[in-house]
Amino acid sequence: MELTPREKDKLLIFTAGLLAERRQAKGLKLNYPEAVALITCAIMEGAREGKTVAELMHAGTQILTRADVMDGIAELIPEIQVEATFPDGTKLVTVHNPIV
């Protein structure tokens, strides 16, 4: 199977997001890469499902709370930018203050 660099990046994000999801389900607090991966993965999946950029910008702030992440992690992530593939093309989704 031949994958482009972009496809490899998407698979890596999905894998990291899945790991973060499993750790969160176990009750573990997420670290920086896990938190970013979980939010990024959710945005990418939402885009694939046909949600709008505005819907995803809002949804990105509802995924994690400060209680879900290790101390200080929320302050390390002032925004997350995701280049996601929508049914009508690729768009940049920016989520400001994703962890509330």
Swiss-Prot record:
InterPro entries, per database record: Urease_gamma, Urease_gamma/gamma-beta_su, Urease_gamma_sf, Urease_subunit
Sorted UniProt keywords: Cytoplasm, Hydrolase
Keyword NAD: no
Entry's EC annotation: 3.5.1.5
Gene Ontology MF terms in the entry: nickel cation binding; urease activity
SUPFAM superfamilies for this protein: Urease, gamma-subunit (SSF54111)
Enzyme class: hydrolase
Subcellular location, record wording: Cytoplasm
Reactions it catalyzes: urea + 2 H2O + H(+) = hydrogencarbonate + 2 NH4(+)
Main location: cytoplasm
GO annotation (BP), single: urea catabolic process
Keyword Cell inner membrane: no
UniProt-listed CDD domains: Urease_gamma
Bridged cysteine pairs (disulfide): none
Pfam families, sorted: Urease_gamma
Known pathway: Nitrogen metabolism; urea degradation; CO(2) and NH(3) from urea (urease route): step 1/1
Signal peptide: none
Gene Ontology cellular component terms for the protein in this record: cytoplasm
HAMAP family: Urease_gamma (MF_00739)
Family: Belongs to the urease gamma subunit family.
Self-association and partners: Heterotrimer of UreA (gamma), UreB (beta) and UreC (alpha) subunits. Three heterotrimers associate to form the active enzyme.
Name the UniProt record assigns to this protein: Urease subunit gamma
Organism of provenance: Dechloromonas aromatica (strain RCB)
